[in-house]
Amino acid sequence: EAERSEGHVTGKTIHLHPKHIGGAIVSIDKMEPELAWLWAGLDWEKCVSKNDNAERLCGVVMQSNDKSALCKKWEKAFGVQADENLQINFSDSRIKFVDDLDQRGEGINAFELSVKNKEIFYEKAEELGLTKNGLIHIGGVNFLLQ
């Protein structure tokens, strides 16, 4: 657990290690004021395009050889029960647990992004050589556009 203040912004965080929950490091953060993001600095918004096509991260797909066991660890960590499809739902995002789809073992298979225009994303990814099997694929992780 850590806390840091700079200027008018205070950030608090706790990290959950993969050894405890499986699959990924999870960072749970709280900023005051709520729209600040201290970890990126006090002026981070100046570096973000106001016309950006990306709207938000709306989900993550976790893969495992034992998706039910992994899901149970995450349920316990977040204090939330998954539905019958092994999906933990939050107010504006979700975590889906699936079988090991690419034989890389337990971990993040994909991030789900809400975007304004999928075609623009796919064109840019193709131009940059970031597609694999028809998906946007960066650093071993797929990016699924919603």
Where in this protein do the model-derived segments appear?
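Amphipathic alpha-helical segments
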Residues: 66-81, 124
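Vicinal oxygen chelate
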Residues: 1-55, 59, 83, 87-104, ...
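A generic structural signal for alpha-helix starts
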Residues: 65-69, 116-119
